[in-house]
Structures are given as C-alpha cells and as structure tokens.
C-alpha cells in the first residue's frame, strides 16, 4: 500500500476522484447544501444527508441514488447536542465509515444591529458556530481512529468583509474561519485536514428576498469584479478539491469563492479617474 505521505500516491485527474469515499453533508434540504452534496456525488462519493426534518430529504436522496451512489438520510438539529451525537453514530453505522464532512448547516437573521435581539444572536451563533464545532468533534473521532479525514467548514465572504445588517452572521462566520485554523492544528497529526470554503453572494432560498430588490442587485453586481452572483456549480471544483487527495497538504485554509468581491473594490463609489499624485 502506498504510504499516506507519499506524493506519488495520486496524480492527475485521479486526485479528484472520490469513488469509495463516504461524505456527510449537513443542511441538505435545500440551497448550497444540495449544490455541494451533488458535486461530491458526481465526483464519486456516497452521501449521508441531514436536515432537521428527514422528510425534506427524500427527493434529494433519490436524486443522489439516480447518479449511482449510495445515500442515506438522517435527522439532525445542530443546536441540540444529543441530536448531534445520535446523528454521528447513525452516520458511522450507515456505510461503516466517514471520510468527508461538509459542515454546511446554518441560518441567518438580517437586521440592523440596534434591532438584533438576544434570541436572534443565540440562534445564529448556536447554529453556525457552536453547531459546526460539535458536529466536527463528533465526526472527527472516527476519522482520527482511522487516520484519515477531510473536514470542510462552510464559511462566508462575511468572515473577511463587513456588511450592514449581518453583524451576528458575520461574527459566526468569522468564528468558523478561526475555528478551522485551530482544528487544523489540533488534528493534522492524525491525518485529518480541516479547511473552510467561503462562498460569496449566491442566489439561494435563504436570500431570495434580497435578489427581488433590483437596486440592491445592481449595487451588489457593481461590487463584484466578475459582475455576477455565484451560480450553483461555481462551488463544485472547490468542494471536490478540498474533499479529495488533491488537497492532501492543504489544511487550516479559507478558500473564498466569491467572484472577487473580497478584494475590497467598491466600484459604485469610484466614478471619476484617480487624481494625479501631488509632489
């Protein structure tokens, strides 16, 4: 058997092949969770899906199976520790192992900072940050025993840029970015990599109200160097890379897939040529 640290173990397109791998993706009842899970399935991975209501997963589970992959669905409430532990045990038992975890389950409440309630804050931080940590902890135990794992925490461009009305959400995603680095340092010696995939602005059910506001969309597009929001398949290559042997020496990193908006360019505010430098 080729040693795990042998650089010749994989090469070329085989480095992106997930055949034989089992991936857990949380929050797969809709939106980005389904985009990410679909990409992993197309790359060869078998899938374990989760949502607070298992009934919401039936259609997507059938879609995954139609691709020739194994799939199983379980209930998971990431705000409940007992639910996390039960899910981790069920997921391990389903196909005998877990190679990949995509920590995707999340939520948001958009409000001006002065209107954010105590409950709003707790909902967002408990779901996005605390939930991600304890799901990773529960799943990583088996990965560490087997000496192999790929953990992908889903972050956001809001972890590196400030957006009005997204204070608690940005804080939760900034926490995910830091947590990713800490867990990478903790678990690297066991053969487990931990990285963060941070999408920019994508059209999802969670933010569809925003995209109904033409003025807001025009403002957003002007800030994105690539002049469009993200499309569902724009995340495919990134998640497969982080889940595969291609990223075998990559850990603790945040990969932004955001069309360049995190460069900080604010084109809408720059309408005139730059002034000549003065002496």
Mark where each language-model region is.
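The beta1-alpha1 cofactor-binding region of Rossmann-like NAD(H)/NADP(H)-dependent oxidoreductases
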Residues: 76-87, 118, 233-234
């Amino acid at each position: 058997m080729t040693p795990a640290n042998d650089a010749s173990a994989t090469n070329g397109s085989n480095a992106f092949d997930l055949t034989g791998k089992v991936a857990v993706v949380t929050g797969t009842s809709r939106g980005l969770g389904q985009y990410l899970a679909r990409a992993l399935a197309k790359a060869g991975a078998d899938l374990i899906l989760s949502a607070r209501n298992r009934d919401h997963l039936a259609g997507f589970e059938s879609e995954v199976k139609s691709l020739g992959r194994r799939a199983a669905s379980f209930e998971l409430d990431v705000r409940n520790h007992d639910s996390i532990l039960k899910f981790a045990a069920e997921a391990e038992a389903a196909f005998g192992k877990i190679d990949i975890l995509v920590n995707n389950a999340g939520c948001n409440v958009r409000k001006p900072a002065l209107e954010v309630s105590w409950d709003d804050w707790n909902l967002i931080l408990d779901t996005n940050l605390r939930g991600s940590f304890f799901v990773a902890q529960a799943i990583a135990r088996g990965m560490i025993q087997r000496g192999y794992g790929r953990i992908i925490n889903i972050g956001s461009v809001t972890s590196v840029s400030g957006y009005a009305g997204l204070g608690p959400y940005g804080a939760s995603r900034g926490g995910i970015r830091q947590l990713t680095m800490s867990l990478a340092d903790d678990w690297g010696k066991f053969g487990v990599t931990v990285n963060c995939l941070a999408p920019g602005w994508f059209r999802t059910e969670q933010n569809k109200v925003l995209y109904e506001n033409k003025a807001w969309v025009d403002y957003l597009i002007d800030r994105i160097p690539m002049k469009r929001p993200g499309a569902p398949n724009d995340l495919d290559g990134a998640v497969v890379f982080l889940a595969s042997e291609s990223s075998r020496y990559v850990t603790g990193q945040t990969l932004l897939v955001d069309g360049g908006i995190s460069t900080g360019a604010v084109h809408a505010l720059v309408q005139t040529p730059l002034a000549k430098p003065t002496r």
